[in-house]
């Protein structure tokens, strides 16, 4: 069995809907991944084992997904020097500001790259992981470049189609 390049670690199965666009992006880019459900607080030994063994398994990037206290990405980063991306899950507190701050406020020396809360966060985490992989994988880099070009063409097409032009004095 091929080792996954990316491992998603979710604090709860309720986080799954927030990463679907990200999973689709990795599939489109043909990047191998696995999804694990582990809690920094309820299964700390399993999180520790996953983090410590990720590199030897061939994993290149870890993505931690959590809401509320959202310690999972930081706990992953504390046990590995692999890149860790944190995805904050929206909560009732200011749309996930608590989650975002829990992930982004890491002490010096234990970095966690952090993306937006919500659906765009899951997709952007996948694309950031792909960008990291693309440094050493020309196929992934080319696919990302093509995706950006397609995105730009769609926006320019809508601009031309809608023809919205506002001029002022």
Model-derived features: positions:
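Short glycine/serine/threonine-rich phosphate/pyrophosphate-binding segments
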Residues: 15-19, 44-47, 66-75, 94-97, ...
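Short, ordered loop/turn segments at secondary-structure junctions
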Residues: 13, 38-40, 67-68, 89-92, ...
């Amino acid at each position: 069995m091929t080792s996954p390049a990316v491992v998603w670690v979710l604090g709860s199965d309720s986080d799954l809907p927030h990463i679907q666009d990200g999973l689709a992006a990795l599939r489109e880019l043909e990047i191998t991944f696995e999804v694990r459900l582990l809690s920094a607080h309820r299964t700390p030994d399993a999180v520790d084992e996953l983090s410590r063994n990720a590199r030897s398994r061939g994993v290149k990037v870890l993505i931690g997904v959590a809401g509320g206290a959202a310690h999972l990405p930081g706990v992953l980063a504390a046990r590995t020097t692999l890149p860790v991306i944190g995805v904050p899950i929206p909560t009732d507190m200011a749309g996930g500001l608590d989650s975002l701050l829990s992930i982004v406020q890491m002490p010096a020396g234990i970095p966690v790259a952090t993306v937006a809360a919500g659906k765009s966060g899951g997709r952007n985490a996948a694309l950031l992981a792909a960008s990291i992989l693309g440094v050493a994988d020309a196929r992934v880099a080319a696919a990302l470049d093509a995706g950006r070009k397609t995105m730009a063409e769609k926006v320019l097409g809508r601009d031309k189609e809608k023809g919205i032009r506002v001029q002022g004095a």
